[in-house]
Amino acid sequence: MIEKIENGLYRIQIPLPRNPLKSLNSYVIVGKRSLVIDTGFNMEECYSQLRKGLEELGLELKKVDVLATHLHADHLGLAGKIAKNLLISKVDAEIAIRSVIEPDYWKELVEFYIRNGFPEKEAKKVAKIHPAVKYASEFSGEIVFLNDREILEYGNFSLKVISTPGHTPGHVCLYDADKKILFSGDHILFDITPNITFWETMRDSLGEYLLSLEKVYELEVRKTLPGHRNFYN
């Protein structure tokens, strides 16, 4: 299902089967080169819906870039199937790559869970069924690292990258100052919590998240477009 939000801007709701999040908001900015903001899990149900939406918009995949607001598989998973160029923060890209190519990543995570009171059996189970394991991206194209405050031009949008660590170490939001539109990823959600968790690269993820909230609080926003559920004017 495609929903027009503004001229040149659309939302495709991507189902997330058997997941309490239910769906992901994938935003598409149409232009000479089009931009897909967040993609869904690397699984057939998600791919089919995203591909169908892009085809309905008349987009050629060779003219599409993907931007992941952060590393989670529900946002990054399909990048490798629809684009050759991926835009993502450097810190989140490094974590995502490590989680795929380094076996010790999950071993260390399981050990951390156990040290902090998780039953060993459950900790090992989590490492096997974690979405980052089951639905990870198979991306093999060019990765373009996003920098805080840089401007991206797609279609009739001028997007300022805003570093908003908290939900993940390298989470970013995108802000069009003229249109007063904020793409908030999972930094700001209206119907559910953004879920702030421990990251080994962050000493205080909750503190960082609160600082990031202050950062976007000063923006003049007409419409906030989150990664999940409803968006609000």
Where in this protein do the model-derived segments appear?
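A short catalytic or substrate-binding loop motif that flags glycine-/basic-rich loops and adjacent residues
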Residues: 19-21, 144-146, 165-168
